[in-house]
Amino acid sequence: FQASKQISRGEAILSATGLEGGGLYALSPALRQGASLTVDLCPDLTQDDIAQRIDRPRGKASWSNHLRKKLRLDKVQLALLAECGRPLPDQPAKLAAVIKALRLPYSGLRPLDEAISVAGGVPFAALDQGLMLQTMPSVFCAGEMLDWEAPTGGYLLTACFATGRWAGRAAARYCGHDPQDTE
């Protein structure tokens, strides 16, 4: 997937409400800014490789069957190409260009209550070295309270646990306890 100049390779699920998945999460900042979204349906092939493969005689095979066989496109990829690539070019080189950068229209991101992870939060400039709010002593922030583009999955959990430990140790010191005593 590509949005603006950012490229992300990963999986996505096509559902009734749109696309979601690890391949898209990294592109969220660019998509929020209105960047167009494209998908490379054959990321392991060059545009020339694709053009050469589809330029072979197809006999009585339909275009979709020809593309399925020559490029190993699955039903979802073929459906996206048919829906978002219309009208499909007849020339192999032009069709290869569409396959390498198929533009996927979207109307925006899903609502906040459906989010897996969100951007925004307390800016790091508002915190001290122990993740305590500079304007509200004794209030510590960690995990998704912080303003950062958090990755999803195990990385997010690891970062939340790490910042929780960081803030917790700082809170213990703030209360006059030695966090070394509890390890």
Task: Tell me the role of every PLM-derived stretch.
Residues Q2-A142, P151-G153, T158, A172-H177:
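Residue-level recognition of phosphate/Mg2+-coordinating polar/acidic sites
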Residues G164-A172:
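N-terminal Rossmann-like FAD-binding beta1-loop-alpha1 element of flavoenzymes
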Residues M145:
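Active-site metal-binding loops of divalent metal-dependent hydrolases
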